[in-house]
């Protein structure tokens, strides 16, 4: 039986899955990074934990290993940020948010998965006999149909009699139809252009990306208050005030600039790029990072130097902490906030906006289209 089906069966039957250091059933280990084999059932043989499964990444059809799949199941109740961080620390390939959700739903039996290929469903009992019986019936029926065709005589009816035998030239009619189709297409195209123009303008809102790292000082819980009101709330405190759990997937905020060239602008803030379309990257103006390169793994520009050539980079730290090496290695700007003295926050945020606006005016390709 396939390893994915064995895992799903073990989950359904609530059986203990054993991680093994070797193919011996007695070599049990606790940590997944120490495991070389995995045992789902005492009646089956241990399976190499790094063997590819039939759970694939749709973008390139690459197969996730059994280690990646099982680790995603073990951390199913953790946030996506914490899961990605642990994958990075252990060197395990991580699944994206949508891939992990899809996998967990399939393992729990609540839905099918488009990421899983080539799994054979078990045949119901008696299916072979039923198929044989059906083949016999079909063969018998085909003989009867052939007999009917051989002994059927075609007769004329009022429809066949009215059919003419003289060939008719429809070229002139075909030309009229083509002219009508082209005229309709031109009208529809002009109407579509009128509808699309305001939509394109609305969709030019610049995008800010946050780091999903658990060590990030700016999260989806506290970023809006920080950038709009100039007040920094520690991430743990902000998450607690919001009732815990994951923050929103998308935040829209307005910023009124002191520079008359900018006026009031609307920014979109997201943490992950799973739902990004290719043209969204033209709208990304800023990336907040913690200095961990795994953050950019699924970005259009996954290499830090290349990324921060195209977007403005910020790295937020507490006052008194040593400057992170990324501030000079990657060309990102360090932003320092006080741990306790909140009266300094507004000035820090004002300086951040000034730096971002200057970058947008000089470097952002879509800036000219917004003026």
UniProtKB/Swiss-Prot annotation:
Statement: the UniProt record of this protein carries the keyword Phosphoprotein: no
Alphabetical UniProt keywords: Activator, Cytoplasm, Nucleus, Transcription, Transcription regulation
Cellular component terms per the entry's GO annotation: Cdc73/Paf1 complex; cytosol; nucleus
Keyword Transcription applies: yes
One GO MF term attached to the UniProt entry: RNA polymerase II complex binding
Localization of this protein: Cytoplasm; Nucleus
Domain of life from the UniProt record: Eukaryota
UniProt-listed GO biological process terms: positive regulation of transcription elongation by RNA polymerase II; transcription elongation by RNA polymerase II
InterPro entries, per database record: Cdc73/Parafibromin (IPR007852), CDC73_C (IPR031336), CDC73_C_sf (IPR038103)
Family per similarity comment: Belongs to the CDC73 family.
Oligomer status and interactors: Component of the PAF1 complex which consists of at least cdc73, paf1 and rtf1.
PANTHER family linked: CDC73 DOMAIN PROTEIN (PTHR12466), PARAFIBROMIN (PTHR12466:SF8)
Function: The PAF1 complex is a multifunctional complex. Involved in transcription initiation via genetic interactions with TATA-binding proteins. Involved in elongation. It regulates 3'-end formation of snR47 by modulating the recruitment or stable association of nrd1 with RNA polymerase II.
Record protein name field: Cell division control protein 73
Organism: Schizosaccharomyces pombe (strain 972 / ATCC 24843)
